[in-house]
Amino acid sequence: MSEISLIMLAAGNSTRFNTKVKKQFLRLGNDPLWLYATKNLSSFYPFKKIVVTSSNIAYMKKFTKNYEFIEGGDTRAESLKKALELIDSEFVMVSDVARVLVSKNLFDRLIENLDKADCITPALKVADTTLFDNEALQREKIKLIQTPQISKTKLLKKALDQNLEFTDDSTAIAAMGGKIWFVEGEENARKLTFKEDLKKLDLPKPSFEIFTGNGFDVHEFGENRPLLLAGVQIHPTMGLKAHSDGDVLAHSLTDAILGAAVLGDIGELYPDTDMKFKNANSMELLKQAYDKVREVGFELINIDICVMAQSPKLKDFKQAMQSNIAHTLDLDEFRINVKATTTEKLGFIGRKEGMAVLSSVNLKYFDWTRL
């Protein structure tokens, strides 16, 4: 049995997919797409090593200890070159995680022809009339190249050392004078590029699990600046002591959302030792945090917030706070509830030394079936 390693390319920005969630984090059942695709291929062969390129290594590592991860580059070629540094097997298989449904039959065709050339690649024939600059091309000579592809590792490394931009391994190998062998590709191995492509693939739907997070924050009164809650000015001078603008509600809610998605906490994301967050707009930081949560495949279901303050009274501001949260997070207002309570003059809150906020949120996986 030939010694083969597997590289899965999952560091793309999903620009053409045009959704808040990166396509590699779409959930198929409970698995993000990148993991589903990698599990699928890894079930076909005892690979020597499996390497996944990533733009979010810390988060991906939460899912498995079975693979190695490496930060991707700005282009496909850069990402592949970095991943190849970890590979020493004779052959390497490279695939895009966006090709989710590669079959065992296609995989076997690649393996069976391993000794035929320097790179074995699947390709589809073109059935439709094809024009270039309004002139018909000979479609019999046109191939639609797919992945996974298997290459001789040393030759692929040498090809990429030219620092040219190759869009796949076969063109890189061919540029070195290497021999390419084509096997029959398949429709199911088409790349998921645009959100409309989801309708063409029979993928498992995201599970209906719900993820709950809580956030709690406390701040002391004492700054002669506006008191802000959810970006709404409550009082012109009763400001809270903080590195940022002191919006304790926004801080609590940020922590709740990050916690539900298992993405750490506000202190990790926006440390108070970093001067770029000095007097920062906390609602803008909340939005940025939620963008990160959506990027990895989640969306909000609802928000419930309890503000604990002896003073000032908040009854007249609750509606404005709910509206501002809804606008910031692009969430229906009927999914947001803000409550206010005192501590019956007990403790530091009762002594009007500060205030606290407890936030609870529920998240679900982004439902890509609605696209």
UniProtKB/Swiss-Prot annotation:
KW Nucleotidyltransferase (keyword) present: yes
Residues at the site labelled Positions MEP for the nucleophilic attack: R139, K191
Catalysed reactions, semicolon-separated: 2-C-methyl-D-erythritol 4-phosphate + CTP + H(+) = 4-CDP-2-C-methyl-D-erythritol + diphosphate; 4-CDP-2-C-methyl-D-erythritol 2-phosphate = 2-C-methyl-D-erythritol 2,4-cyclic diphosphate + CMP
Residue segments, region 2-C-methyl-D-erythritol 2,4-cyclodiphosphate synthase: 211-371
Sorted UniProt keywords: Isoprene biosynthesis, Lyase, Metal-binding, Multifunctional enzyme, Nucleotidyltransferase, Transferase
Pfam families: IspD (PF01128), YgbB (PF02542)
Record site feature (Transition state stabilizer), residues: R16, K23, H243, T342
Record's protein name: Bifunctional enzyme IspD/IspF
Function field: Bifunctional enzyme that catalyzes the formation of 4-diphosphocytidyl-2-C-methyl-D-erythritol from CTP and 2-C-methyl-D-erythritol 4-phosphate (MEP) (IspD), and catalyzes the conversion of 4-diphosphocytidyl-2-C-methyl-D-erythritol 2-phosphate (CDP-ME2P) to 2-C-methyl-D-erythritol 2,4-cyclodiphosphate (ME-CPP) with a corresponding release of cytidine 5-monophosphate (CMP) (IspF).
Associated pathway: Isoprenoid biosynthesis; isopentenyl diphosphate biosynthesis via DXP pathway; isopentenyl diphosphate from 1-deoxy-D-xylulose 5-phosphate: step 2/6; Isoprenoid biosynthesis; isopentenyl diphosphate biosynthesis via DXP pathway; isopentenyl diphosphate from 1-deoxy-D-xylulose 5-phosphate: step 4/6
Cofactor: a divalent metal cation
Source organism of this protein record: Campylobacter jejuni subsp. doylei (strain ATCC BAA-1458 / RM4099 / 269.97)
Domain of life: Bacteria
InterPro entries (UniProt xref): IspD, IspD/F, IspD/TarI, ISPD_synthase_CS, MECDP_synthase, MECDP_synthase_CS, MECDP_synthase_sf, Nucleotide-diphossugar_trans
GO molecular function, one term: metal ion binding
Residues where a divalent metal cation binds: D217, H219, H251
E.C. designation(s): 2.7.7.60, 4.6.1.12
